[in-house]
Amino acid sequence: MNNELIIKGKKAKEASYTLSFASTNEKDNGLLKISEFLIKRCDEILEENKKDLEKAIEKGTSNAMLDRLKLDEERVKSIANAVADVVKLDDPIGEVTSMFKRPNGLRIGVQRVPLGVVGIIYEARPNVTADAAALCLKTGNAVILRGGSEAINSNLKIVEIISDALKEAGLPEGSVQILEDTSRETATDFMRLNDYLDVLIPRGGAGLIKAVVNNATVPVIETGVGNCHIYIDDEADINMGVDIIVNAKTSRPAVCNAAEKLLVNEKIAEEFLPVAIKALKEKGVEIRGCEKTKAIVNDINLATEEDWGKEYLDYILGVKVVKDLDEAISHINKYGTKHSESIVTKNYFNSEKFLQRVDAAAVYVNASTRFTDGGEFGFGAEIGISTQKLHARGPMGLKELTTNKYIIYGNGQIR
């Protein structure tokens, strides 16, 4: 076991105990200090981010991934503001969600408490570093971060700044830490750090999620992989459908709530596809379509079986013509990742059937999948989008970083 993991694990465990009973004011003061320090030391962050970008460009990293990695003054301000916004959210810790009395006179309550020490493994998104720190701090959890090698310089600087801010705020050393060793061996050991980690949350592409699920012995909350579909029903508004798919695919193609597949009812395909594909191509999207799609719009690439299950995270879209709503639902439930799915239709009964039968964390009617986000749902910042069913599902805000403690009041009862 890597010595860095043991040292940081012990520090995190100690910090989590102190954080578990820190007051809301103490935690909020820490968050405001973090926000202030991030803005004050923006130039230091950008200097380190420049190093990461230069390395990524040398490696031939895609433009979409470079966009996830890149920071500028506006993005750093946005990150800092997101941290400050967490102060405005209600502190769930200590909340008694229910209280009931037993016939023997015992009063039993259910209280929200921190999870303890949260481990987060993620890829080339430096904003995750600050988001995760803020959410864990607000909920009284210590956090150990393991970012990707692509953003190591940016992440180390951000955590250094966060640590300095927490020290000034009087919060414990070890509240927010990051692994400096980004090797796969250390990552695997991190996934098995059961003596110190209470939960592990991976954020990234399918490869990362699979590696964590297959190797971790620490309990995992699976997040992130988004093979999201937009289904255009035969009773869809054409203009609305075009607007939704263009937004869902191109507004930020490298995020997990971006659309990766477009399914079109055969009754509307000849009218809809030429307009939609033209609009998508104008945004630089490569179309990979089924044979029926290619028969309608010839100037596209043919999709393979592999395409239907793939999360591109790029300016690529799979397009398939389907017979009806039932085939669309069947296709989504077969190839989807239970993240976010959307139907565009004017038919109420079709929309209700879609909502009921599609198995996903977020199911939309006449809206872009890009709204699956803690901020857009009104939860504030998020730790990720859970695609599993145990503990948490969908955008994970503050409450999803807590667990229950039963508190029992008696007056001498014995059994």
Curated annotation (Swiss-Prot):
Main location: cytoplasm
GO biological-process terms attached to the record: L-proline biosynthetic process
Keywords of this entry: Amino-acid biosynthesis, Cytoplasm, NADP, Oxidoreductase, Proline biosynthesis
Pathway involvement of the protein, from the record: Amino-acid biosynthesis; L-proline biosynthesis; L-glutamate 5-semialdehyde from L-glutamate: step 2/2
GO cellular component, one term: cytoplasm
Enzyme superclass (EC): oxidoreductase
Keyword Cytoplasm: yes
Reactions listed under catalytic activity: L-glutamate 5-semialdehyde + phosphate + NADP(+) = L-glutamyl 5-phosphate + NADPH + H(+)
E.C. numbers: 1.2.1.41
Keyword 4Fe-4S: no
Subcellular location: Cytoplasm
GO terms of molecular function: glutamate-5-semialdehyde dehydrogenase activity; NADP binding
Primary role: Catalyzes the NADPH-dependent reduction of L-glutamate 5-phosphate into L-glutamate 5-semialdehyde and phosphate. The product spontaneously undergoes cyclization to form 1-pyrroline-5-carboxylate.
Family the UniProt entry places it in: Belongs to the gamma-glutamyl phosphate reductase family.
Protein name: Gamma-glutamyl phosphate reductase
Organism: Clostridium perfringens (strain 13 / Type A)
Gene: proA
